[in-house]
Design a protein with these regions (language model features):
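A short alpha/beta connector and helix-capping loop motif
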Residues: 16-47
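Active-site-adjacent betaalpha module
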Residues: 1-2, 29-32, 54-175
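N-terminal nucleotide-binding beta1-loop-alpha1 segment
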Residues: 4-7
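Short, glycine/acidic-enriched capping/hinge loops at junctions between secondary-structure elements
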Residues: 15-17, 53-55
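Catalytic metal-binding/acid-base residues of hydrolase active sites
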Residues: 9, 47-48, 81, 108
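Glycine-rich, small/polar surface segments that engage phosphate groups of diverse ligands
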Residues: 46-49, 60-62
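Short acidic, Gly/Ser-rich segments with clustered Asp/Glu that frequently serve as metal-coordination loops
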Residues: 9-15
């Protein structure tokens, strides 16, 4: 198993996210438990391209201060919603390691987390989604709360991912 931390970057990790404090606390718990158990923590960062303010070298691009990677932890860069798009190299990396179980956390529930969950499933990976370890902001169609519940409680379970309570996620990291 690996823990995949998706797009938890300075420019978008803030109070606009649904259940912000719970989200931050849960990701910190997951990262801590994974490291304690020797489970690889992998970071994915979204790059909107040069001169956008959200690209390599920009403060907004950097991983959120409370989730900082260790020097030896892998980082993959993407420019589309799915972390498994060929350009990132993530799928090839996991395939080479023969890794099939991916616990995912990060943002945005309705964009990059959804795309990565569905793509991971399509590539034969077991995607595990801990409760309140992904989040999003309001959009013109749904509130952040509606979006969170739609994906975590309706779309993903029994289709694309194992959506598990936080205590179960922590147990899985200890196996």
């Amino acid at each position: 198993m690996v823990l995949l931390v998706v797009d938890a970057q300075n420019g978008i990790v803030d109070e606009r996210l649904y259940e912000f404090r719970k989200f931050v606390g849960n990701i910190k718990k997951l990262i801590g438990a994974a490291r304690e158990q020797g489970i690889e923590v992998i970071y994915v960062q979204h790059d909107d391209g040069p001169d956008t303010g959200f690209s390599i070298g920009d403060d907004e691009f950097e991983v959120y201060s409370e989730f900082q990677p260790m020097p030896d932890e892998k980082r993959f860069i993407k420019s589309v919603c799915s972390a498994f798009k060929k350009e990132s190299g993530l799928l090839e990396y996991l395939t080479a390691k023969e890794e099939k179980d991916v616990m995912i956390c990060g943002i945005m529930t309705d964009f990059c987390i959804n795309a990565t969950v569905e793509a991971g499933f399509e590539h034969g990976l077991l995607m595990i989604v801990p409760a309140y370890a992904n989040s999003t902001q309001d959009n013109e169609y749904m509130t952040r709360e509606q979006a969170y519940h739609y994906y975590n409680e309706f779309l993903w379970p029994e289709r694309y991912a194992d959506c598990v309570p936080m205590d179960r996620a922590l147990e899985l990291l200890k196996k």
